[in-house]
C-alpha cells in the first residue's frame, strides 16, 4: 500500500450484489451486488453455469424458488464464480450442497540514475557485480498498472479492472513499485533491484488505488497461466477471503512466488493476502533498520525491506519518493528475481526459504521476521 507523505490504510469497502426472483411473485428488481461463489469441485461449477445459461441467468432452486444471477467470471483454476446477485438470495443459494461458500467481492487497496538508499541497503549492487540482474525472470506486478517510462521495460500484461482495459497506470502506485523491482541500468533516473527482470503489468486496482477480490484473483490466475516466476502484491485488506486464499494457493502450486505487503496500519497483525501461508509477507524498515511506524507485524511476517522515503519511477516519466509496505515488497520481489536467475531450477518454495535463511537478522522476529532481505548473501 502506498503512503505518500501520510497514512493510507487498507480498507474493505464492499462491492457486492444479488437479485431475488420467484416463480410465483415478481417484485421490483433489487439492487445487485458482487459476490464470489465457491464450489466443492470444478464439475459443480460447470453444471451450475450450464443451468443459469440455459434459464436466462436464473438458477432454479426448487419448483417455487428461483434466483436471478448475472455471471461475471468463471475462474479456470479454482472452483469459483464471480457473480452479481441481490443480497436477499444469498441464504437460499447457500443451501445448495454443491456450494462451499458465498462471500462478498470485497475491495482491496494499495499498501502504498541515482541508486536509491533501499537498493543499496539490500545490497543489490553486489549481486549486479556478479552478473546477476534478474535476466530471464518474469515478474508480475499486480497493482494499478504500469505507465510507459524511459526507465522501465514492460514486456506485457493484462487488465482485470472493469472499465479500465489499458494496463497504463492512472494512479502512480504500480509504476513506483515496478521501478523498485526493475528500473533499468541505463544511466538515467534510478536503478532497480533486478534491472534486467521482465516486468508484466497486471492491473487489478483502478485509478483510485482500490479493486475487488475477484480482480486480484484473476490477476493471480493470469500469473500462473503465463509462467510468471514472481508476483508482487503491494496491496491488502484487513478481511480474509476464501477466494483470494485459493487464488494464492493455486498460483503457488503453479510455481509463482507470491510476495505481499504486510499492511500500513501499524497493527500487530498481518493484512491479507500477506497473512496466507503461501504468500511471503513483507514489512517495512527505515534508514536506521528500525521497523517503520506504519508497518504491520506479528505472526506470519516473513521478512522486511526498506519502505521509507523510497525513490522510484512515477507516471509522466518522472520520479517520486513514497512510504509504505508497498514500497518494501518490491525490494523482496527483486531479490527473488536475482536468486531465480542464479538458480533457475529452484522452486518458488526454495527461493522463499533461501531469502529468509540469508536475511540479515534485526532482532525481534515478531517485528522483523527473518530480518532484512540481503541480495549479496542470497546470491553468493
From Swiss-Prot:
- Signal peptide (UniProt feature, chain positions): 1-27
Task: Give the cofactor note.
Answer: Binds 2 calcium ions per subunit.
Q: Per its Swiss-Prot or TrEMBL record, what regulates the activity?
A: Activity is inhibited by phenylmethylsulfonyl fluoride and chymostatin.
Q: What is its EC number?
A: 3.4.21.-
Indicate the residues removed as propeptide on maturation. Answer: 28-111
Which residues are catalytic? 143 (charge relay system), 173 (charge relay system), 326 (charge relay system)
Q: Which UniProt keywords apply?
A: Calcium, Hydrolase, Metal-binding, Protease, Secreted, Serine protease, Signal
Domain Inhibitor I9, chain residue ranges per copy: 34-111
Q: Does the keyword Zinc-finger apply?
A: no
Has the keyword NADP been applied to this entry?
no
Q: What about temperature dependence?
A: Optimum temperature is 55 degrees Celsius. CaC1(2) markedly shifts the optimum temperature to 70 degrees Celsius.
* InterPro entries in UniProt: Peptidase_S8/S53_dom, Peptidase_S8/S53_dom_sf, Peptidase_S8_Asp-AS, Peptidase_S8_His-AS, Peptidase_S8_Ser-AS, Peptidase_S8_subtilisin-like, Peptidase_S8_subtilisin-rel, S8pro/Inhibitor_I9
Assembly and binders: Monomer.
Q: What name does UniProt use for this protein?
A: M-protease
Amino acid at each position: 500500500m502506498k503512503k505518500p507523505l501520510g497514512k493510507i490504510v487498507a480498507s474493505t469497502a464492499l462491492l457486492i450484489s444479488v437479485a431475488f426472483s420467484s416463480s410465483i411473485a415478481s417484485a421490483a428488481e433489487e439492487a445487485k451486488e458482487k459476490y464470489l461463489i465457491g464450489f466443492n469441485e470444478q464439475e459443480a461449477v460447470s453444471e451450475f453455469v450450464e443451468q443459469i445459461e440455459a434459464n436466462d441467468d436464473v438458477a432454479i432452486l426448487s419448483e417455487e424458488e428461483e434466483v436471478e444471477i448475472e455471471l461475471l467470471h468463471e475462474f479456470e483454476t479454482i472452483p469459483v464464480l464471480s457473480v452479481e446477485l441481490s443480497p436477499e438470495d444469498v441464504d437460499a443459494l447457500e443451501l445448495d450442497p454443491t456450494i462451499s461458500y458465498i462471500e462478498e467481492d470485497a475491495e482491496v487497496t494499495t499498501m502504498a540514475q541515482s541508486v536509491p538508499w533501499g537498493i543499496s541497503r539490500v545490497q543489490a549492487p553486489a549481486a549486479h557485480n556478479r552478473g546477476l540482474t534478474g535476466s530471464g525472470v518474469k515478474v508480475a506486478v499486480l497493482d494499478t498498472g504500469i505507465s510507459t517510462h524511459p526507465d522501465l521495460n514492460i514486456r506485457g500484461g493484462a487488465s482485470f479492472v472493469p472499465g479500465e482495459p489499458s494496463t497504463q497506470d492512472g494512479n502512480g502506485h504500480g509504476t513506483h513499485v515496478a521501478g523498485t523491482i526493475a528500473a533499468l541500468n541505463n544511466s538515467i533516473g534510478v536503478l532497480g533491484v533486478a534491472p534486467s527482470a521482465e516486468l508484466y503489468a497486471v492491473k487489478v486496482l483502478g485509478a483510485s488505488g482500490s479493486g475487488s477480490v475477484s480482480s486480484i484473483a484473476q490477476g493471480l490466475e493470469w500469473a500462473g497461466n503465463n509462467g510468471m516466476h514472481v508476483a508482487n502484491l503491494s496491496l491488502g485488506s484487513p478481511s480474509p477471503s476464501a477466494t483470494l486464499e485459493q487464488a494464492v494457493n493455486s498460483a503457488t502450486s503453479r510455481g509463482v512466488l507470491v510476495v505481499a505487503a504486510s499492511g500500513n496500519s501499524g497493527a500487530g497483525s498481518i493484512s491479507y493476502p500477506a497473512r496466507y501461508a503461501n504468500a511471503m509477507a513483507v514489512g517495512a524498515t527505515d534508514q536506521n533498520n528500525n521497523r517503520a511506524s506504519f508497518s504491520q507485524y506479528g505472526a506470519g511476517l516473513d521478512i522486511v525491506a526498506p519502505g521509507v522515503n523510497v525513490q522510484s519511477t512515477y507516471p509522466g516519466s518522472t520520479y517520486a519518493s513514497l512510504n509504505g509496505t508497498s514500497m518494501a515488497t518490491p525490494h523482496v520481489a527483486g531479490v527473488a528475481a536475482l536468486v531465480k536467475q542464479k538458480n533457475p531450477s529452484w522452486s518458488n518454495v526454495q527461493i522463499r526459504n533461501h531469502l529468509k535463511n540469508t536475511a540479515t537478522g534485526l532482532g525481534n522476529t515478531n517485528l522483523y521476521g527473518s530480518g532484512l532481505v540481503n541480495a549479496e548473501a542470497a546470491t553468493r
